[in-house]
Amino acid sequence: MNREHAKAHLLLEALPYIRNFYGQTVVIKYGGHAMVDEQLQESFALNVILLKYIGINPVIVHGGGPQIGRMLKLLNIESQFKQGLRVTDDATMDVVEMVLVGKVNKNIVNLINLKGGSAVGLSGKDGRLITARKLEMVLERGDAPPEIIDLGKVGEVTGINTQLITTLLAQGFIPVIAPVGVDEDGETYNINADTVAGAVAAALGAKRLVLLTDVSGVLDKDKTLISSLDIKEASQAMADGVLVGGMIPKVSCCMEAVDAGVEKAHILDGRVENCIILELFTRSGIGTEIVCKRCQA
């Protein structure tokens, strides 16, 4: 089979997947190494543009932790973390918003547009896209009294303005969302990007939620990739201590999304070129899919 015939064969192999996703929404959380490596940045942009051109509606939510950390260091503002979340005082919040909304967001928008897409950058403040409230975190330690952890201006999502997103999608745009929210009094909050992506996917009734990470997916106790997890199995993996560290909030976010009606959630290695296409348009995929069998019954 020559190269041209092989290419035609590959396109035909993708047809069932394209048909399945046509007209559907896919929410992608963009973060990790894929945001800082130029080759991976280009691969990401082209994957997103391809989705749009074949009739799928991609919505991007991005992080920016390393970029925020570098700017805070440059400004001699000390970074503090509690339970894996950045403590965000007023000065830090100003930097977070400046970096996420003014720099990272616009860089992503510019890259997609340069590669032939039509992206529009948004923060949660635009059209009250993301409404939020202060995150209240309580840490329980055995018989000790519960400890209330004050993270400052770290928020949790209370609402998503889906009309704004669907209006942009209907006009052919690719929304790119910075995870900054606002409460009813106008206070600004720093929100975990995975959490925002999950909330956006659930609110939109998206077909898929995709989280890009710096690992191959969810690993078992032997460090072997788990290709598929039901939410019950995921809960058990947490209880058994199989899931640790930063993977816990990612899996929790996916579980909440599929429980709310998203068909599947995926955790992928963003360091792999074309990881989005490989996961969505091949039978085996390359990462971990999280499903709710009960919800689909």
From Swiss-Prot:
Gene3D superfamilies: Acetylglutamate kinase-like (3.40.1160.10). The record marks 29, 250 as: Transition state stabilizer. Substrate binds at residues 64-65, 86, 190. The keyword RNA-binding does not apply. GO terms for biological process: arginine biosynthetic process via ornithine; L-arginine biosynthetic process. Its EC number is 2.7.2.8. GO terms for cellular component: cytoplasm. It holds the Pfam family AA_kinase. Pathway: Amino-acid biosynthesis; L-arginine biosynthesis; N(2)-acetyl-L-ornithine from L-glutamate: step 2/4. It comes from the Bacteria. HAMAP family: ArgB (MF_00082). Catalyzes the ATP-dependent phosphorylation of N-acetyl-L-glutamate. This is Acetylglutamate kinase. It comes from Solidesulfovibrio magneticus (strain ATCC 700980 / DSM 13731 / RS-1).
